């Protein structure tokens, strides 16, 4: 993956040096369990839960959570923070990927006469304050919070992709594109939020007559975010080529992203954690589905190809 021509974003909130819960003025726990989180509180608690030791039913898998209280328990928000462009290698990488998503989604929205308001990406280590449920913790994986329109990312998850999930080769350039896919997936949730898709999905989940039906809607949301990540990658690559610049995607990059998508599919994670698969409990989609929908967006470069809610084959 070539980073040279990607623009940097100043919408990065770097909390990595704060430790603990930045700005919270004291510790507080993540209010999970007992139906304490609604889908409106945390729409996508990232790409994983269980392989890091968290029961997914406590995060996003349970109908009792999806139909839980409409107002999550939230600690008093920290003081306003400054965003900037980080200067370390990892921070600049994240900034460049985020900057690229901003450029591409601004263009897509502008074509429809809409304004794209980019999310803020919060970098942290260990744990930090979030407006969804009170806290972000590294074991939750990356996630998007609709309440504050921020993406939360503990970059240690990138190490997990290579070492624990074996989604890419440690230290390789292709591993960077797998990491970019993770960021683009979460930004995809922000796009869904701006387009009104997430609120409609929330309403549909609350009206669902079973846990399996509510989970199915969540899978549709997640697979669409995978597809939108593919759309971003296609558009950035084609734009650079049209400008006479080398594409930012290099040989092996897409394959690495597909390996990552497969590694964090619900069936793969369930089989690894439990030894068996329960399809009705899926919340993000199978390995095959995640690969296919990312590829759908990447090959088409069109948002219209990402309508998982109307597709005959999910």
Where are these regions (language model features)?
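Pan-zinc metallopeptidase signature
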Residues: 262-314
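Short pre-active-site segment immediately N-terminal to the catalytic Zn-binding motif
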Residues: 159-182, 213-219
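Catalytic zinc-binding patch centered on the HExxH motif and its immediate surroundings
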Residues: 127-164
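Long amphipathic alpha-helical segments used for membrane anchoring, targeting, substrate engagement
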Residues: 1-81
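Post-HEXXH active-site segment of zinc metalloproteases
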Residues: 193-218, 222
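Extracytoplasmic
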Residues: 93, 100, 116-119, 137-140, ...
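Short helix/loop segments within enzyme catalytic domains
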Residues: 92-116, 213-269
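Active-site recognition of the HExxH zinc-binding catalytic motif
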Residues: 47, 105, 153, 181-194, ...
